[in-house]
Amino acid sequence: MKDLVKFLKAQSKSNDDFDVIKIGLASPDKIRSWSFGEVKKPETINYRTFKPERDGLFCARIFGPVKDYECLCGKYKRLKHRGVICEKCGVEVTQTKVRRDRMGHIELACPVAHIWFLKSLPSRIGLILDMPLRDIERVLYFESYVVTEPGMTDLEKNQLLTEEQFLDAEERWGDEFEAKMGAEGIQALLRDMDLEHQCEMMREELQETNSETKRKKITKRLKLLEAFQQSGNKPEWMVMTVLPVLPPDLRPLVPLDGGRFATSDLNDLYRRVINRNNRLKRLLDLVAPDIIVRNEKRMLQESVDALLDNGRRGRAITGSNKRPLKSLADMIKGKQGRFRQNLLGKRVDYSGRSVITVGPYLHLHQCGLPKKMALELFRPFIYSKLESRGIASTIKAAKKMVEREEPIVWDILAEVIREHPILLNRAPTLHRLGIQAFEPILIEGKAIQLHPLVCAAFNADFDGDQMAVHVPLTLEAQLEARALMMSTNNVLSPASGDPIIVPSQDVVLGLYYMTREKVNAKGEGMYFLDPREAEKAYRTGQAELHARVKVRITEHVKNEAGELVAETKLLDTTIGRAILWMIAPKGMPFKVFNQTLGKKAISKLINESYRRLGLKESVILADQIMYTGFAYAARSGASVGIDDMVIPAQKHEIIRAAEAEVAEIQEQFNSGLVTAGERYNKVIDIWAAANERVAKAMMENLSTEEVINREGNPEKQASFNSIFMMADSGARGSAAQIRQLAGMRGLMARPDGSIIETPITANFREGLNVLQYFISTHGARKGLADTALKTANSGYLTRRLVDVAQDLVITEDDCGTHEGIVMTPLIEGGDVKEALRDRVLGRVVAEDVLKPGTEEVLIPRNTLIDEKWCDVIDAESVDVIKVRSVVTCNTDFGVCAKCYGRDLARGHLINQGEAVGVIAAQSIGEPGTQLTMRTFHIGGAASAAAKESSIQVKNAGTIKLTNAKFVTNKEGKIVLTSRNTELTVIDTFGRTKENYKVPYGAVLSKNDGAEVAVGEVVANWDPHTMPVISEVSGRIQFSDIVDGLTVTRQTDELTGLSSIVVQDVGERATAGKDLRPALRLVDAQGNDILIPSTDVAAQYFLPGKAIVTLDDGAEIEVGEALARIPQESVGTKDITGGLPRVADLFEARKPKEPAILAEISGIVSFGKETKGKRRLVITPAEGEAFEEMIPKWRQLNVFEGEMVQRGDVISDGAETPHDILRLRGVHAVTDYIVNEVQEVYRLQGVKINDKHIEVIVRQMLRKAVITNAYDSEFLEGEQVEVSRVKIANRKRAEEGKPLVEFERELLGITKASLATESFISAASFQETTRVLTEAAVAGKRDELRGLKENVIVGRLIPAGTGFAYHQNRAKKRNQPEQAGAFEAPVAKANGFATDADIEAEFEFVADDATQSLAALLNAGDEE
């Protein structure tokens, strides 16, 4: 025991306990201190003896012995000589392991610039010397001199001299000045830098300068100089005089058979450096001519460059096989580099993989493990059991027994496996449910058996998928596997909070079949005592499964006290439903079972069960449902036959009619009445409509059949057609697929997404002819190619998301903020996209919710809204709630539980230590592969939607108009004169039911506050033109409307009416450039009429292309159109859909033609125009007017004299999230990104909780730009973490200083990942070289806060069960004096601890970990 304790003690000491990792530049002395000797020769090993050469790259004297405890010449062998240095060969006798960590060094004959600091942009050496990179390179590669000491001459320091200039200068001044070339020159300049003085100068310059670019440049340089000052790095260390040599076992040389060697590329690169270095030393000793020495120096510089980062400068050095050699930089970067290959992902022992097959008889927490695999995986456990039982005397004997597979071994295996969970994993692991724990059941055969209900989580199917098995070894690991990862503990999806253990396919079909009802089935109208009797009747053939009968049902209902009370009723049901009720757990209502169960209904049922009865019952129910479903699916005998695809009789008639219509359109086109585009669109519309009609006829035909009921009358019932049942239940197939089988295939898309106008009129049952087949392959092949590309893109998006969010963990319970985001139901047009209850479920209320219309508190602040509260919200018809959100959370590092709300996968408030960032990233990334790359415009749907021209109300209620300005015309109708008007319909409870955008110039039949009935049309407008509405009555007076200059006259050939068309500025003659055509309204005397309630004259400027049909001097009434502006057809813009759109949003990319937003609130006017742009002026109520130049071709949404609010959209186009953040703030940008991302996912029918997107948005917003720094540690214009500014501001507030002012900045996820505080995390993500260079120069410290950093240094992550471990370490760090007191008693009088003390200490450590785990596990049960 003593030895063991000593051994443990020694082991635990070796693990240096560190809290921070610092990276910096290595000084030459530092490199020499690491080194165990200088490498002088380029030789590696002797080709005959295979012994390393002395002083060579593998020298045993420098790096350590080749064999354990044995010197090279063999004089000293074995352990007793440990630590002796052999006098003959100079090798220390020790473990050969030291060859992995002992470094050597090379003394360079001349200094060499480090390529990372030279060439990694922006060049650090260039920045600190304030010289362009080109000049530095010319000095380094010996093309020109640089002045290092100007002396009393007219040369400047840092000035470059060519060879001639240098010689001239030397003649003039002799040795008064000093100029050098090569790295010596650069090193001298760096050594002479006075950092403090430079910083002072830069600061002064910053104060004086006004130019933006200069400020930026100075700030950059100042930051670098300050970093050097603070980190203690010296600038001259960026030029190396000593080169470290990697330990030899990290760049091995392996003899192959046949006398050849396989070697690491690094050895080649080192050999080159040493050869050139030695040659240079010799040349310097011989005092060779300058030009030769220079060439050698340049070659040395190049070879060192290649060793550090091959291919960064010039051509990469290649090996014998023409492939570039792998340098030190290549070793760490990229997917195969050190970070991603060996530190973030490791291969593990105790694992195996095999094909999976279905295990329909398993319980949810079990999986079938082949005996062969189990034997191999649990080997050590079996050995120890065999030995401890005394069955085998030694481990060796045990091994023999296992290899012979003796019968006793199988018994022991069964014992070992019992209750030892194993992990199953299916690649690709897109979310955390891709690895789950199961209890193994030993089976014959070689395939793993998987429970069918977990397939959805793994996204597995049994067409040859493989899965990997891992064995958790330690007790803690087994505990975690059982408590956190067991498949029974993962019933709900972390992405949406819905059950993920949901039956699919066969099971659904079986349940659907057994709960259907049939008219006049055998046994209809019978009465049964209980479900058991009903089942008996079915089994004995006295009644059919679908017969409508009456059965006595006993339900268990909760009473006031919350106890279950039995209630028995006689209910109408069917035999199948009664049988299904037998597996229902107590406390479920019968009405959930007493219906035809499709996939949705079953999912609801499991969800209901989980919320009512908890985990255990739900899991048992799911299992029972599965067994029943399989059994009855087999009974149903549903199959697919060709006769099940019934083609509707009306099909030919419908197609004939459509063909006739198309012919007519073609006729019109030939006679020039419609354009080619119109013809194409109309043809597609006709065929799309025909397809719909055929499909409708087909579905009516398939879905119902007429039967004779008991009274002898015909009655319609849902049909028992197999194909229809499969689609209707949601087991397999969809209406769209049946349409292709039995209706018509319809319109096909080309690979670019455009629609081929000839449809395929045949269906698959009739068969396609060659042409039709060819057309359909066209778009289908694109689909297959897309899928392959999609997967890679989706994986990359997930990786970026994980990287940006990885360090977000729940770190405290409540940050105490009162901020939050305001939630309302999502309404688009006439339908509720998402009800309020779905949006606030699982959130915490930020402010008391009042009962509508009263001051009474309905839901107090800080309440977690669960299903019960949702019902209250519905009942009281609340339609706006302020909930807490991750984006507004005040916690410095991490998020608080209250702001996050419910843990979706567990159903209670989230625990501390939960890694919400990673969960969010996985939830968004996992469905990524399902998102189509491009949204195919389904026949004509895209063009139809854009051309709305009226609003028809779907619900009765009251109309409410927002942002509305209008005039009333002579018919008493209202004509809108405002831009972004919204029309909402509100029901009697004050809930918003519908929400529409109404365009300018629309005619409304109802005013604000009017009542409407269902189906009423409340607004009309012309979708093709935009009118200019007169706001007063009067006579028209033309202004600047000159024929031939600003306008042209057109006469319609058919009607003979003439109209005036305004020309674009670009098309006018020079004389007309400055004229601004307008219509003024005057009274009979010719005076301007003022617009009511303003002092602005009524005159309307006409944009280009506007058409005026009225004449000068015509009378016009208020609300009439003065002119019309034709609208380019909207909706032809191809919207990027699917994955690329999501990526664009998270990368915060600026759209090509972003919308222009109003920078301030005020009145719009237009100033003087220039050639291609017009000047937009916004004049606020007080303060400066704001001017902006806008290109002519942009369509503006505002008229002169209109009032705009800050952040309003002025011109069409997509909004930039950066603008939204700047002008409308954090809430608006969160809203924007969340809604836009959800839009994409909703189209695909994927449900993701808003929380996850908010988490990513929080990470995108974690940087701020300092706008006013006062006397703080920040610089103006510097980008800093928001949390750092907040911490600084809290301190300043206590000291009574003014707070640092800052603006939040939105970064795309890639940028945000690279801008993280942790350089380890950033380096392992992308652009490794750049990140490490920057970090080293700045002497950055990594606090190891995130998950990635801790994985890389090999620690427990500060999340989940590792959260407590990190908290304890933090506590100990913050209270060193108490820690000392705690450790004092262990040291006894004699200064040594007893074994018992040490044992106790070790026990404490183990307990600590288990306690924290126990605490975490209990947190889930307290609810």
Swiss-Prot record:
GO molecular function per UniProt: DNA binding; DNA-directed RNA polymerase activity; magnesium ion binding; zinc ion binding
Cofactor entry: Mg(2+); Zn(2+)
EC assignment: 2.7.7.6
Cofactor binding note of this UniProt entry: Binds 1 Mg(2+) ion per subunit. Binds 2 Zn(2+) ions per subunit.
The protein's name: DNA-directed RNA polymerase subunit beta'
Record-listed Zn(2+) 1 binding positions: C71, C73, C86, C89
The gene coding this protein: rpoC
Gene Ontology terms: cellular component: DNA-directed RNA polymerase complex
Similarity comment: family membership: Belongs to the RNA polymerase beta' chain family.
SMART domains tied to this protein: RPOLA_N
Origin species: Actinobacillus pleuropneumoniae serotype 7 (strain AP76)
Residue sites binding Mg(2+) per the record: D461, D463, D465
Record keywords: DNA-directed RNA polymerase, Magnesium, Metal-binding, Nucleotidyltransferase, Transcription, Transferase, Zinc
